[in-house]
Amino acid sequence: MGQSLLSSFGDAQQRVEKSLQALRQGEGVLLVDDEDRENEGDLIYSAEHLTAKQMALMIREGSGIVCLCLTGEKVDELKLPQMVTNNNSRHGTGFTISIEARDGVTTGVSAADRTQTVKAAIAEGAVAEDLCQPGHVFPLRARDNGVLDRRGHTEGTVDLMKLSGLAPAGLLCELTNVDGTMARLPEIVDFARKRDMQVLSIEDIAQYRQGHNL
């Protein structure tokens, strides 16, 4: 069922290439994982092109937990410690301590404030002192070799940004249904079609990377 739904967006290579083009144009995509993993779809946007309107969409249509996916190098530059020293969560998601921009925000929770926090974190030359902790944006540390190390949305997001030629930082938020349950592939595809968004899978990225260097 999953492949038949995804096939309407092209084959694996086409899905990746269409998604890369959308990201370069400042648009969002939907990234799904396997049915035997989280079986979820995440709204993905580039941090480089992020707007407050896109942040608001993630907050409104998603879980509300907006995460900033970063390379390990960037996390180290910002001196962001992991949220816990012993990560025993089911999928080992690399949460760091949450962040807020030191300047240019009020309570930090609005779409505009969260966008400002993202921009502060990814700015060239950004340092730890540009941020406060805790905050309302949740950084995630991606594995160094991306989806080839871990088939996670975090790694998929950073890989997409690298393949797009964008700054290697992206936003994700899990898509939810109106009743608060997690959206599954049929709902994810329906959401994408209504908003003319591209859908691809983490496995698509893994296959694509076999023939394309980051």
Swiss-Prot record:
Function of the protein: Catalyzes the conversion of D-ribulose 5-phosphate to formate and 3,4-dihydroxy-2-butanone 4-phosphate.
Protein name (record): 3,4-dihydroxy-2-butanone 4-phosphate synthase
Cofactor names: Mg(2+); Mn(2+)
EC main group: lyase
Swiss-Prot/TrEMBL site (Essential for catalytic activity) positions: 136, 174
Any one Gene Ontology cellular component term annotated for this protein: cytosol
Binding-site residues for Mg(2+) 1, renumbered to this chain: 38
GO molecular function: 3,4-dihydroxy-2-butanone-4-phosphate synthase activity; magnesium ion binding; manganese ion binding
Organism: Desulfotalea psychrophila (strain LSv54 / DSM 12343)
Cofactor: binding details: Binds 2 divalent metal cations per subunit. Magnesium or manganese.
Enzyme Commission number, as recorded: 4.1.99.12
Annotated catalysed reactions: D-ribulose 5-phosphate = (2S)-2-hydroxy-3-oxobutyl phosphate + formate + H(+)
Binding-site list for Mg(2+) 2: 38, 153
GO biological process, one term: riboflavin biosynthetic process
Pathway listed: Cofactor biosynthesis; riboflavin biosynthesis; 2-hydroxy-3-oxobutyl phosphate from D-ribulose 5-phosphate: step 1/1
Alphabetically ordered keywords of this record: Lyase, Magnesium, Manganese, Metal-binding, Riboflavin biosynthesis
